[in-house]
Amino acid sequence: MLSAFNKFANQMAGAGKTQFTEVTIRNGETDKRIAVIDVTGLITSYGPSDMVANIKKQLKLASKDQRVKAVILRIDSPGGEVMASDEIARSIREFEADPDINKPVIASMGGMAASGGYYVAAPCRDIFANELTITGSIGVIMQSVNFHGLMDKVGVKPVTYTSGKNKDMLSPFNPPEVP
């Protein structure tokens, strides 16, 4: 279900682009262009709208096109998979570090660049955000419900066998641990 939603959301948001769409903003020199790569919606690395593969392909196209002088990464994302975000960030770092490419990547944050959205902006040469952009919070969240008190009240004693101390750390039947 989540996979189907991610696919739908990313298709609606325009993920899955594998080539540039050319838009003329100002008439003038045609040998100097700026590539715009969208990071819109959930950052994910699976399915037909694989954002990681698409962004890597667009960076490769930008690196080979001599008319492209810079890349703008247009971000409007709440984040997504940590591995996908890291892979995109790593691709940007490699693009920026390659002396043969020598083109800046600039992040432009839209309404939201949170978590993985902020993560992919971090290696960019410059980052621009609107004063109302929701941004920040690189990290991972893990949630669980806890039924320990309820189990005590109804007199049920769960038994769990594990091969290590933390194997069942998110079990809803264990007492909550305060870090």
Each predicted region: which residue ranges?
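Small-residue-centered hinge/linker elements
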Residues: M1-K103, M112-P179
